[in-house]
């Protein structure tokens, strides 16, 4: 299984786990009739002082998770009844700075990269535009982006904004992500989605950053301005989210920001910068928990904030309700998980609708929020470390405490196991020893040249001092080649989608070069 496939499976499992809060037997509820319609009645009442009691335990939960995981920093906030009732920072922003430096402490105003928590935030930008009649969830993307296409000419004119915001276009999991790793820009990547095979339209769920980004670009085109400006104008500014942006440069310029830390050999280090500008609508938002409480309060209030209607309720509702099954049940008694437009939508064992989303940057961000509308409560947790399930564990334990008065699952193990699979290195030679007596390679000159590929661009093989390298992408990225056996070489690297320890083969065959890591969908062969 490739890293992208593992990531897709992890995303689905995390969403399913989030929707399965609590499985123990629940006490019998009152038989008094309710004035609410049956679909609005939960299976059990909340415990007395449910939210306050849950909040009282957050310090201990957060401290224990920080200590046991070793992650550098985390910030947590809770919204209830339209107010922020908890906001606190834990740990530090940068392990290379003194831990006792007050300026290095995480606080509620510290800005983190949100990764895929950007998706539901962006969905509320789209919902605003839908409410303004500037666009519809059903608007075909090609109506606003005439250059956009998918590989099936029958699907291209039909695929709508909502299809891409619910991951039901048929595009493969994480389509285009590796192009981003190589440094290609948004337009280049979106134009190459047309080369990818499609699963059946509107009945296949596959999580895509650049599919969703295409939809956001259509919304921005309809508004006549860049997505980043539109988000600021219609959402961040009206909500008073002064530390929130969809531009990486703004995050870089923040004095109070948490650096991303990657885990290598069990230790966290701020070794890489993650610039998500090409997929800004899907993963490029940076914010603080202070700012995010404004957004959570708005979602809980059906689009209203401080007496101002930011998003029309009828435009927001489709985003918060099921649009496709994302985690099918494996047996009749099991609850399925769903995806709305940018939101995970599930039902807990207390029969309460739960909205959520996680964000995950391998290079150093793990984020999560949970909203329980019927309890009028939401929680968000942001971390500056390779995803390991810590924010999800905290929010799941809090959700259990709110609904049941106790934690009912070993969420740390469930989420830890799910994320551990995503962190495994990729490549068929991982863990293998080189051949004891490899077949000799040809002279370096036999391999040198420029090999071309319509999807990935050029791969330029060069020789220096008898050693070969391959250069890819517009920067370019240069990978040193190590001989393995005959015409097979290897290279190692770390990117957002290639965890530490990843090894790719580079296999030469005459005028053809196949790069294993880039051979998704059998598209990794370059021709000289």
Task: Give the ranges of each region predicted by the language model.
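Catalytic loop of the DD-peptidase/beta-lactamase superfamily, centered on the K-T-G motif
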Residues: 20-87, 220-233, 237, 272-528
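Short, solvent-exposed loop/turn and secondary-structure capping segments
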Residues: 87-90, 174-180, 232, 246-250, ...
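Active/ligand-binding-proximal structured segments within catalytic/core domains
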Residues: 122
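Catalytic nucleophile serine of serine hydrolases
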Residues: 116-117, 206-209
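Mid-domain, small-residue-enriched loop/turn segments at the edges of structured enzyme/sensor domains
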Residues: 160, 210-211
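Short, conserved catalytic-motif segment at the N-terminal edge
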Residues: 48-112, 131-136, 143, 151, ...
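Secretory targeting and sorting signals
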Residues: 2-23
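Active-site helix/loop module of the DD-peptidase/beta-lactamase fold
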Residues: 57, 73, 102-104, 108, ...
């Amino acid at each position: 299984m490739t890293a992208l496939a593992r990531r897709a499976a992890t995303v689905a499992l995390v969403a399913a786990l989030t929707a399965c809060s609590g499985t123990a037997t629940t006490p019998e509820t009152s038989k008094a009739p309710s004035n609410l319609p049956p679909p609005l009645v939960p299976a059990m009442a909340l415990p007395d002082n449910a939210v306050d009691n849950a909040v009282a335990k957050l310090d201990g939960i957060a401290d224990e998770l920080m200590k046991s995981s070793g992650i550098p920093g985390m910030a947590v906030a809770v919204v209830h009844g339209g107010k922020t009732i908890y906001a606190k920072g834990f740990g530090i922003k940068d392990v290379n700075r003194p831990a006792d430096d007050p300026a290095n402490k995480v606080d509620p105003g510290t800005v983190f990269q949100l990764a895929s928590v950007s998706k539901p935030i962006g969905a509320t930008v789209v919902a605003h535009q839908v409410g303004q009649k500037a666009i519809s969830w059903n608007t075909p993307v090609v109506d606003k982006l005439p250059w956009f296409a998918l590989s099936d000419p029958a699907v291209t004119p039909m695929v709508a904004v909502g299809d891409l915001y619910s991951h039901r276009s048929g595009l493969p999991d994480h389509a285009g992500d590796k192009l981003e790793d190589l440094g290609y820009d948004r337009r280049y990547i979106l134009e190459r989605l047309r080369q990818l095979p499609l699963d059946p339209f509107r009945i296949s769920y596959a999580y895509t950053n650049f599919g969703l980004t295409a939809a956001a670009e259509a919304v921005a085109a309809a508004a006549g301005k860049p997505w980043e400006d539109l988000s600021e104008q219609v959402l961040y500014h009206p909500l008073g989210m002064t530390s929130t942006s969809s531009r990486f440069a703004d995050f870089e310029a923040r004095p109070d920001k948490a650096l991303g830390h990657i885990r290598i050999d069990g230790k966290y280090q701020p070794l890489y910068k993650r610039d998500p500008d090409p997929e800004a609508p899907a993963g490029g938002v940076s914010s603080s928990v202070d700012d995010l409480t404004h957004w959570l309060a708005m979602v809980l209030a059906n689009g209203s904030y401080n007496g101002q209607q930011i998003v029309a309720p009828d435009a927001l509702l489709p985003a918060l309700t099921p649009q496709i099954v994302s985690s099918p049940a494996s047996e009749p008694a099991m609850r399925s998980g769903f995806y709305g437009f940018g939101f995970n939508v599930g039902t807990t064992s207390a029969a309460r609708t739960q909205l959520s989303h996680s964000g995950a940057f391998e290079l150093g961000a793990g984020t999560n929020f949970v909203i329980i509308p019927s309890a009028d409560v939401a929680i968000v947790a942001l971390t500056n470390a390779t995803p390991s399930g810590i924010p999800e564990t905290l929010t799941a334990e809090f959700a259990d405490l709110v609904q049941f008065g106790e934690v009912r699952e070993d969420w740390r193990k469930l989420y830890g196991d799910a994320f551990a699979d995503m962190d495994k290195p990729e490549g068929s030679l991982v863990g293998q020893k080189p051949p004891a007596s490899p077949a000799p390679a040809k002279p370096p000159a036999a391999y040198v040249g420029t090999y071309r590929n319509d999807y990935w661009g050029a791969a330029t093989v060069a020789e220096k001092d008898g050693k070969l390298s391959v250069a890819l992408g517009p920067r370019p990225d240069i990978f040193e080649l190590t001989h393995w056996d005959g015409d097979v070489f290897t290279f190692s690297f770390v990117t957002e989608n290639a965890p530490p320890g990843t090894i790719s083969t580079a296999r030469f065959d005459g005028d053809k070069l196949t790069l294993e890591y880039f051979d998704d969908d059998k598209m990794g062969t370059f021709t000289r």
